[in-house]
């Protein structure tokens, strides 16, 4: 049985027309084939998704940067122990690339999908592809973020708001009052960490000032934080401390401040 199941039902040797029709009826009922009037009988799309491949697709925003090598290695270790293989893809935090990855994976035989959504704070415009995963009963789980309209789907998240709160609280407990924040605007993690930052300030009786927050996006993440740190020094308005979205941004900001002669942690 390949693309066209049978050109003529009698082409199956030594089987009656009745037997062939009955067999095709059972296959169609079970979803293995589709019959088209006047065209023939074909393998169903469902055949590609029987889920016995022992392949798990893993889609992350990046592969070689930051925390991702260890993250992927951890998943591979666990899956390998259970006899599964990884199909690895990355999106570079691009919605278009995420959609292409899903389209490609829907053409493959996979048993499940682990995916980090791209720009998770924005509306998902390719939700139909996730609906196809549901249609073919391919299980999937979101990691590190989730689209707001898909919160009913399985997901594993850090408590980003609590993380932002604890970091800000730490600086406040050291006696710092003027605390700037550098946060990512197009990922859910950035907004949640910002919420924690605001909560800590408010609990300490410090009014939240939007001007104390630098927002950046995926496209300018390697430029804007350093640029804004430089402008901050040039303005002569140094804060007591800075809360950064993650370690990468913290290092970028620190390096720029040190270039400008700012001592860390003495001055900031």
What are these regions (language model features)?
Residues 1-7, 11-12:
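Single conserved hydrophobic/aromatic residue that forms the stacking wall/gate
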Residues 30, 77-85, 100, 104-111, ...:
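Bacterial carbohydrate/catabolite-sensing allosteric modules
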Residues 48-112, 119, 198, 202:
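Amphipathic helical "hinge" segments at domain boundaries
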């Amino acid at each position: 049985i390949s693309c066209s199941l049978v050109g003529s039902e009698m082409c199956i040797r030594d089987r009656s027309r009745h037997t062939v029709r009955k067999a095709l009826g059972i296959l169609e009922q079970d979803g293995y084939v589709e019959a088209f009037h006047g065209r023939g009988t074909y393998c169903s799309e469902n055949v590609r998704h029987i889920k016995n491949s022992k392949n798990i697709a893993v889609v992350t925003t990046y592969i070689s940067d930051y925390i991702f090598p260890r993250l992927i290695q951890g998943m591979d270790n666990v899956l390998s122990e259970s006899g599964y293989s990884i199909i690895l893809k990355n999106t570079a935090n691009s919605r278009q690339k995420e959609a292409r990855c899903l389209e490609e994976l829907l053409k493959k035989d996979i048993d499940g999908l682990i995916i980090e959504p791209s720009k998770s704070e924005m509306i998902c415009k390719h939700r139909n592809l996730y609906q196809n995963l549901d249609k073919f009963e391919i299980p999937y789980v979101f990691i590190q973020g989730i689209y707001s309209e898909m919160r009913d789907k399985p997901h594993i998240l850090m408590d980003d708001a609590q993380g932002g709160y604890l970091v800000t609280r730490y600086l406040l407990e050291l006696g710092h009052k003027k605390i700037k924040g550098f946060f990512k605007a197009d990922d859910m993690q950035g907004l949640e960490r910002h919420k924690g930052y605001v909560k800590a300030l408010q609990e300490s009786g410090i009014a939240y000032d939007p001007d104390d927050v630098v927002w950046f996006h995926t496209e300018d993440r390697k430029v804007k934080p350093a640029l804004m740190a430089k402008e901050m020094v040039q303005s002569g308005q140094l804060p007591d401390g800075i809360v950064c979205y993650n370690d990468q941004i913290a290092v970028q900001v620190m390096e720029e401040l040190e270039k400008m002669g700012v001592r860390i942690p003495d001055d900031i």
